[in-house]
Amino acid sequence: MELLDKLTILSDAAKYDAACTSSGVRRGFQPGKIGNTTSSIAGCCHSFSADGRCITLLKVLMTNCCVYDCKYCINRRSNDTRRAAFTPQELADLTIQFYRRNYIEGLFLSSGVLRNPDYTMEQMIHALRILRQDYGFNGYIHAKAIPGAAPELVQQLGLLADRLSVNIELPSQEGLQLLAPDKTKDAILRPMGQIRDQARQSKAELVKYKHAPVFAPAGQSTQLIVGATKDSDRHILHLTQSLYDRYKLKRVFYSAYVPVVEHSLLPSVDTKPPLLREHRLYQADWLLRFYGFRAEELLDEAHPDFNPLIDPKCSWAIAHLEQFPVEIMRADYEMLLRVPGIGPTGAKRIISARRTGTLRFEDLKKLGVVLKRAQFFITCGGRVRSGLQFSAASLVRQLEAVEQGQLPAAQMQQLSLFDPAG
């Protein structure tokens, strides 16, 4: 098979993997090396580096041949599809050629399971060794560890890649048994624990020895498929919280299930991917990582799924109206973070600006506050925004209008040239 045909097949087969990011990795310039994406920070496909640039990578599978028969996967053993596999040399050459043509600045490498997990990982490691050692490639590499592979192979992969990830795929053990019987929860979580421990050990050794080998400096991530099973948002979010707490993941990615195969246990191929649900989970994930929320605060047994029409932070605020409205001039940083429309940067600016005078609603816009959401939950100097209603039902209606791009009536005012000043 021609190399171009392999690339076409294996790049297309990799498109369902959402876990592409490079946050947290720093690769400085090294004399005699190639693949430096910036003078200080390397990046990943369609994510942003610290200087605001969008970084691209070559995103491919080592092979789409697979001994597993996961019912949701287009590359499953029983699916009738074109198969291909790169040799390690082919993949390394292809990556270098793409880099030298300025198409990419890094590599995202995953794979189906060819023969067994160990053999597949050996092929991936061989390809990355050629890139790093023979070609001196210093660009960003994100590699997928194969569940069930030997610990020593996971270690070797982590010494070659900037980021590792082990995909959980399905949020529950029941889902795995039903749709991916060849995979087990233990086989997925074991390498996660190893990556966590070895990354921690690597950081400790770097403090003592400047040239100690670096293990997965950009950490690890995972991916969850949303919509292939009946797991609730609450279950998914509690799993996410546990992964962040126990395994110190950098990111959990959510992938709306795209029906690509017909099966009685899966949504029909006519079902639209739950993209809005995926979006709400990402918003909730952001609240866990940067806003101090916990999963149990956002959803409960009575409300196991997010309202698709309102973002999770607004939903939480409406459910806790006893804490609102918040007085902008007195609220502490943690409380400001819980106000819809106010993020970490906005909260810090508010605390700084209010030291010099009383803030008005108009001032908040200049500080980066999203006033179309925040206005419902704050007072400025004891004043409430005119024309707003504060019952839960009215807030839901008004915020749904905001989400749909319609401003509340209180905001829609045409100024007149002949109005008296004041």
Each predicted region: which residue ranges?
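Short Fe-S-cluster ligation motifs
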Residues: 96-112, 284
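Canonical Radical SAM [4Fe-4S] cluster-binding loop centered on the CxxxCxxC motif
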Residues: 60-89
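Long, highly charged, low-complexity intrinsically disordered interaction regions
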Residues: 265-337, 373-422
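Flexible, acidic/Gly-rich N-terminal and inter-domain linker regions that tether
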Residues: 1-65, 370, 378-379, 386-422
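Conserved, mostly hydrophobic/aromatic
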Residues: 57, 70, 109, 166, ...
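Conserved AdoMet/S-adenosylmethionine-binding subsite of the radical SAM
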Residues: 92, 115-298
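Short, charged beta->alpha transition segments
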Residues: 59-60, 89-100, 207-208
